[in-house]
């Protein structure tokens, strides 16, 4: 979905994203570190790598494919990916239309992503499609969503249900 409204939005903010989001990223770092510590030795997909700020939190020696809808965000992530002690392949891709074959990945990780996916159910179906049988989807979300089922899941989580 090259040229989509979502892609244009992230391209526009790529140059100042770190400045605008730094405090929040520091606040969420303990939870993200815990999430990323679950990265196994298999084939891993990281959805919405952005400018690559989270790469420094990844365990070493992993094989990761990291995608983002924004070419400008990916450009910013390149230097961090090069410095990673493992393998990171950066690709431009929309979560709603993944170009991977079915049952490709052992694990999929997302961090603060689905609040920005215009059709989150479609995106989740794509993640399910590309996960191997028994594969894991691990997510960190930071905000309320107006999309079903995230709205209900996040409400239940906040209220202990």
What does each of the following model-derived ranges do?
Residues 1-15:
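N-terminal, positively charged/glycine-rich alpha-helical extensions of SAM-dependent methyltransferases
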Residues 4, 20-24, 138-161:
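C-terminal alpha-helical "lid/dimerization" subdomain adjacent to the S-adenosyl-L-methionine
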Residues 23-42, 53:
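Conserved alpha-helix/loop element of class I SAM-dependent methyltransferases that forms part
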Residues 43, 63, 134-136:
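Short glycine-centered segments of the SAM/dcSAM-binding site in methyltransferase folds
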Residues 45-97:
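Class I SAM-dependent methyltransferase SAM/SAH-binding core
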Residues 96-108:
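A short acidic, Gly/Pro-enriched loop at the edge of an enzyme's catalytic core
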Residues 107-119:
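A short SAM/SAH-binding and catalytic strip from SAM-dependent methyltransferases
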Residues 121-136:
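A short glycine-rich, Lys/Arg-flanked "PGG" loop and its adjoining helix->strand segment in the class I
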């Amino acid at each position: 979905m090259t040229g989509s409204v979502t892609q244009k939005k992230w391209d526009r903010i790529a140059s100042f994203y770190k400045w605008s989001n730094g405090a929040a990223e520091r606040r969420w770092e303990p939870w993200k570190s815990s999430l990323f510590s679950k990265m196994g030795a298999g084939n891993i997909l990281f959805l919405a790598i952005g400018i690559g700020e989270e790469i420094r939190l990844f365990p070493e020696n992993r094989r990761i494919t990291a995608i983002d809808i924004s070419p400008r965000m990916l450009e910013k992530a390149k230097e961090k990916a090069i410095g990673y002690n493992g393998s990171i392949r950066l690709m431009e891709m929309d979560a709603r239309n993944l170009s991977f074959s079915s049952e490709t990945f052992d694990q999929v990780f997302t961090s603060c992503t689905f609040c920005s996916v215009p059709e989150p159910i479609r995106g989740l179906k794509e993640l399910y499609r590309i996960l191997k049988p028994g594969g894991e989807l691990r997510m960190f979300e930071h905000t309320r969503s107006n999309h079903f089922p995230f709205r209900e899941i996040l409400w239940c989580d906040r209220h202990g249900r």
